[in-house]
């Protein structure tokens, strides 16, 4: 098959915060850059980020990037890489002020400086009193970020391909990534995007679960592409369940609500977080708050409702003026999806899948890593990853609120800054052959030639139910082993699924089938990884192994796609500018 070819210095797959920040930096460096997105860029899932960007600006009180680093390392349950966390926290203020200069409309304090609100897990002076570190644009920070970055990419002549779906990476005979193939959703045209640098910025994969804050586009496309290219994925057992999704809908209710003074109640009207986190209370780490809500429900203190047992988030005491000025989006979402007015009554909430802490292992420069037979990190030529799809790892076993947007802009920026230098170090590479390119079309050809078999919608439902029931907030060995066996059966069913719609123009069923392949890859890697880690750490909480085991598990886990087996990778405990923070018991 002779495909049309579009050639660029770099191709960025995904136009959320990380992808657009990387593309902007690449274009500003004078390189030609294609930005591929399966939706219009400002509809990327970053648009739903509400609370803000956590960064030590010191606008509301004295602050220090080292305090931010301490909180992030502690929040990660000590498997966040401290060199990467140091880089993110140290570089963060500069990266955020760049956004301000681009025109991002932050909320303001009375003196005109950027407004910062308290978020969970934040402290002053290495674990002291509560900090207010999260820079916000009301409760629509992600929306403001995407529109700002989109405008800047237009200004800097990034070539944007909206509603193009990346199929798979193209690797040459030497193992270097030489771009990708993609299909135009509007016309069905398939094109080879040739580039010496390919940046995966495809976001999360929360749609492997039944209940998630993630948009329908979050289907783990980058995970699937990486695994099929033989790239390992790291810490895939670590999925954050946000404490406050709207019960019955899964729609996110930002942690900023609790930062502004909201608090959780059980059916007896008790502020139950005082029992689980006496100091931080409702602003403890997200894994702590999510588990606390589920314990209240398991022990019979959950609130009753048509959506099942849940907790209540009380905001009405803050007053109408505060809610309308600082949390206008939450008022709208609550009235639409929960049918309650937070000015008058609490919001029904329950933990729901929110964020993938694991992903593709990378350097601070965004270069994707594998591990050789000697256990050493090696760079995969031509491949980069940034944002939620990447595992730098700054989040470890539990992400702090507001650090996701900081991750996007700091490491999207870093990948763009170092991309040309990385390619120069890589040297000359041979072009991909026709057979290399055709190999990336195998999935598309399989779906296009399948007219009989099982309905992929039913397979997707079965996958999501399996993950929700066996790999949720609390986990247990027998249930996870059973869940893995169920996934093996579902994976076999997927091989015999059918594509009914054979049209070319806006064939959304074809895209959904291709997405289902990626959901399956992501779910399977998650299940194998979760069975492997026999301890409780951060978001990975096991009834049969309730304690953290630093002797055995102070490490990353790596899922190897070729053998579907697990290995370990060392956590980086060597920051460059200050001593490392040693592991301690996490208390809030």
Curated annotation (Swiss-Prot):
<keyword id="KW-0560">Oxidoreductase</keyword>
<dbReference type="GO" id="GO:0005886">
    <property type="term" value="C:plasma membrane"/>
</dbReference>
<dbReference type="InterPro" id="IPR037099">
    <property type="entry name" value="Fum_R/Succ_DH_flav-like_C_sf"/>
</dbReference>
<keyword id="KW-0997">Cell inner membrane</keyword>
<dbReference type="InterPro" id="IPR003952">
    <property type="entry name" value="FRD_SDH_FAD_BS"/>
</dbReference>
<dbReference type="InterPro" id="IPR003953">
    <property type="entry name" value="FAD-dep_OxRdtase_2_FAD-bd"/>
</dbReference>
<keyword id="KW-0816">Tricarboxylic acid cycle</keyword>
<dbReference type="GO" id="GO:0009055">
    <property type="term" value="F:electron transfer activity"/>
</dbReference>
<comment type="function">
    <text>Two distinct, membrane-bound, FAD-containing enzymes are responsible for the catalysis of fumarate and succinate interconversion; the fumarate reductase is used in anaerobic growth, and the succinate dehydrogenase is used in aerobic growth.</text>
</comment>
<keyword id="KW-0813">Transport</keyword>
<dbReference type="GO" id="GO:0050660">
    <property type="term" value="F:flavin adenine dinucleotide binding"/>
</dbReference>
<dbReference type="InterPro" id="IPR015939">
    <property type="entry name" value="Fum_Rdtase/Succ_DH_flav-like_C"/>
</dbReference>
<keyword id="KW-0249">Electron transport</keyword>
<comment type="subunit">
    <text>Makes weak or transient interactions with SdhA. Part of an enzyme complex containing four subunits: a flavoprotein, an iron-sulfur, cytochrome b-556, and a hydrophobic anchor protein. The complex forms trimers.</text>
</comment>
<protein>
    <recommendedName>
        <fullName>Succinate dehydrogenase flavoprotein subunit</fullName>
        <ecNumber>1.3.5.1</ecNumber>
    </recommendedName>
</protein>
<dbReference type="Pfam" id="PF02910">
    <property type="entry name" value="Succ_DH_flav_C"/>
</dbReference>
<keyword id="KW-1003">Cell membrane</keyword>
<dbReference type="GO" id="GO:0009061">
    <property type="term" value="P:anaerobic respiration"/>
</dbReference>
<keyword id="KW-0472">Membrane</keyword>
<comment type="similarity">
    <text>Belongs to the FAD-dependent oxidoreductase 2 family. FRD/SDH subfamily.</text>
</comment>
<dbReference type="GO" id="GO:0008177">
    <property type="term" value="F:succinate dehydrogenase (quinone) activity"/>
</dbReference>
<feature type="active site" description="Proton acceptor">
    <location>
        <position position="286"/>
    </location>
</feature>
<feature type="modified residue" description="Tele-8alpha-FAD histidine">
    <location>
        <position position="45"/>
    </location>
</feature>
<dbReference type="InterPro" id="IPR014006">
    <property type="entry name" value="Succ_Dhase_FrdA_Gneg"/>
</dbReference>
<dbReference type="InterPro" id="IPR036188">
    <property type="entry name" value="FAD/NAD-bd_sf"/>
</dbReference>
<dbReference type="InterPro" id="IPR027477">
    <property type="entry name" value="Succ_DH/fumarate_Rdtase_cat_sf"/>
</dbReference>
<comment type="pathway">
    <text>Carbohydrate metabolism; tricarboxylic acid cycle; fumarate from succinate (bacterial route): step 1/1.</text>
</comment>
<dbReference type="InterPro" id="IPR011281">
    <property type="entry name" value="Succ_DH_flav_su_fwd"/>
</dbReference>
<dbReference type="GO" id="GO:0022900">
    <property type="term" value="P:electron transport chain"/>
</dbReference>
<dbReference type="Pfam" id="PF00890">
    <property type="entry name" value="FAD_binding_2"/>
</dbReference>
<dbReference type="GO" id="GO:0006099">
    <property type="term" value="P:tricarboxylic acid cycle"/>
</dbReference>
<dbReference type="InterPro" id="IPR030664">
    <property type="entry name" value="SdhA/FrdA/AprA"/>
</dbReference>
<keyword id="KW-0274">FAD</keyword>
<keyword id="KW-0285">Flavoprotein</keyword>
